[in-house]
Amino acid sequence: MAEEVYDGAIGIDLGTTYSCVAVYEGTNVEIIANEQGNFTTPSFVSFTENERLIGEAAKNQAAMNPANTIFDVKRLIGRRFDDPTVKKDMESWPFKVVDDNGNPKVEVQYLGQTHTFSPQEISAMVLTKMKEIAETKLGKKVEKAVITVPAYFNDNQRQATKDAGAIAGLNVLRIINEPTAAAIAYGLGSGKSDKERNVLIYDLGGGTFDVSLLNIQGGVFTVKATAGDTHLGGQDFDTNLLEYCKKEFTRKTKKDLSGDARALRRLRTACERAKRTLSSGAQTTIEIDSLFDGEDFNIQITRARFEDLNAKAFAGTLEPVAQVLKDAGIEKHQVDEIVLVGGSTRIPRIQKLLSEFFDGKKLEKSINPDEAVAYGAAVQAGILSGKATSADTSDLLLLDVVPLSLGVAMEGNIFAPVVPRGQTVPTIKKRTFTTVADNQQTVQFPVYQGERVNCEDNTLLGEFTLAPIPPMKAGEPVLEVVFEVDVNGILKVTATEKTSGRSANITIANSVGKLSTDEIEKMISDAEKFKSKDEAFSKRFEAKQQLESYISRVEEIISDPTLSLKLKRGQKDKIEQALSEAMAQLEIEDSTADELKKKELALKRLVTKAMASR
């Protein structure tokens, strides 16, 4: 690869099921195709005895290697092992998730050994793949990127995504919210207008769901409110159809395939395909030969059946829509445009429900739902790296918001919000607290994110201690807590005791699900090692193929009476000896590419010498 470094930055939509990469130069955004010519790449990583596969290659062999093929990692990133959604997902995942001090990690067999990887490392592998797709197109090394996350991601999930970027060797210029990125794609693509518009972005992807209401005027994109579910998407619709098919299989055959990971993977793939077909057709057939225990499976699925199986999930997507309107303080009729983003918005029933919610309003489908988020990320990347020269982007300004309130726990585990949800970022907010006991010299500050009164119902982001503070009567010390949220939506908290001036702070980076600088550096070095192992395997495979091909040609020469006559006297034995050595080298499992090439070269020299005119 060319060592010249690209002076711009790329935009990456790191999706639950598929990822997409784009670049913005001058006045054009280009969505970059992978080596198969597809504009989206599966967010899959697979491990085998010999190599690591990422993207299309990983997904294509998932049924053959279910326990070592990782997907849905976006549903693990920044979460605790004991998170109820993690527990629920583990029931349907064919790969193993283990508890590492409260952090979930995936366990796989790779290169003949057991390895565990954090969600950040797996995400980094997908990001590396997207980076390489861009590098192939640009012919230069890429070092900078803007990465998107669901608007409803909490602080832990945002920081973990930023860490994944660092492990992939990327300087993450900005983390931006997916619906905001899609709004940029829509706002620029629909021709910039100075007319003020209220635009609702309905973003339903493979694993996450966001609704954002933006006010767009000229180049200013102001997020008024956001809501969503970081655990709802196409994967869940597939799962509901899968569960139905499992029951039907058991009803027809009296056999239970629940424990067979390969059968489940094949069935899930068929269900995903059926779901896509039903977006345009009224019915489809799922047909799988010898699905389990020699039994074939054949079932007809109508669109009505699929809609019925997912009725609750589909209807549930309207709750965040209502929430966003309420938070933004606007009525349905004040929404000018409703923009569909994410592959799952192709489902006709979802479109119908959303249109009916807005009293039959026409939905906006002018942007590609799979590519819009990467498009917007690329525009932001172009602006931040100085590559965007278009008049459309010269005055582009993004004003995003905090999706969930941030605060601390008070006595009785009551949540005290400091930064309310919907607050524009970046922001700094202060709140004053005091002590609850006489002569108290230590104060704990557990930091939470959420909307519930009881802190246990919110997400613990981390905690820190302010000590020692001067002994005083309860209620006398003045403890000022400052919350700073940066443009990436990442939080830093500082507490100061005003009389002594003593302070303590935390950039939420050491709690569960977070990585220390040392851990990130180790993961970067591991990622480099795995990359070099991948490259060595590819080179070895190529050298092996070339040697095998050349051996076949030489065998043809010495076994063909006419051709063998052209060999110099006494040379045939030497060639046969070299052939034996080359074949022996092929049998050695850990032969390097260099060793294989040397055998090929030695054989070529002998043949060339023997074929020389006498």
Curated annotation (Swiss-Prot):
Gene3D superfamilies from the UniProt entry: 1.20.1270.10, 3.30.30.30, 3.30.420.40, Actin, Chain A, domain 4, Substrate Binding Domain Of DNAk, Chain A, domain 1
Region (Inter-domain linker): 393-403
Reactions that this protein is recorded to catalyse: ATP + H2O = ADP + phosphate + H(+)
Region annotation Substrate binding domain (SBD): where it falls in the sequence: 404-614
InterPro entries tied to this protein: ATPase_NBD, Heat_shock_70_CS, HSP70_C_sf, HSP70_peptide-bd_sf, Hsp_70_fam
A GO-annotated cellular component: cytoplasm
SUPFAM superfamilies: Actin-like ATPase domain, Heat shock protein 70kD (HSP70), C-terminal subdomain, Heat shock protein 70kD (HSP70), peptide-binding domain
GO molecular function terms noted in the UniProt entry: ATP binding; ATP hydrolysis activity; ATP-dependent protein folding chaperone
Top-rank EC class of the record's enzyme: hydrolase
Region of interest: Lid domain (SBDalpha): 517-613
Key word Protein transport present: no
Compartments it resides in: Cytoplasm
Region described as Nucleotide binding domain (NBD): spans on this chain: 1-392
Binding of ATP, residues: 16-18, 74, 206-208, 272-279, 343
GO terms, biological process: translation
Keyword terms of this UniProt record: ATP-binding, Chaperone, Cytoplasm, Hydrolase, Nucleotide-binding, Protein biosynthesis
Keyword ATP-binding attributed: yes
Coarse class of the protein's main subcellular location: cytoplasm
Enzyme nomenclature, EC number: 3.6.4.10
Pfam family, one: HSP70
Similarity-based family: Belongs to the heat shock protein 70 family. Ssb-type Hsp70 subfamily.
Function: Ribosome-bound, Hsp70-type chaperone that assists in the cotranslational folding of newly synthesized proteins in the cytosol. Stimulates folding by interacting with nascent chains, binding to short, largely hydrophobic sequences exposed by unfolded proteins, thereby stabilizing longer, more slowly translated, and aggregation-prone nascent polypeptides and domains that cannot fold stably until fully synthesized. The Hsp70-protein substrate interaction depends on ATP-binding and on allosteric regulation between the NBD and the SBD.
Subunit structure and binding partners: Binds to ribosomes. Binds close to the ribosomal tunnel exit via contacts with both ribosomal proteins and rRNA. Directly interacts with nascent polypeptides. This interaction is dependent on the ribosome-associated complex (RAC). Interacts with SSE1. Interacts with FES1.
Protein name: Ribosome-associated molecular chaperone SSB1
Species the sequence originates in: Chaetomium thermophilum (strain DSM 1495 / CBS 144.50 / IMI 039719) (Thermochaetoides thermophila)
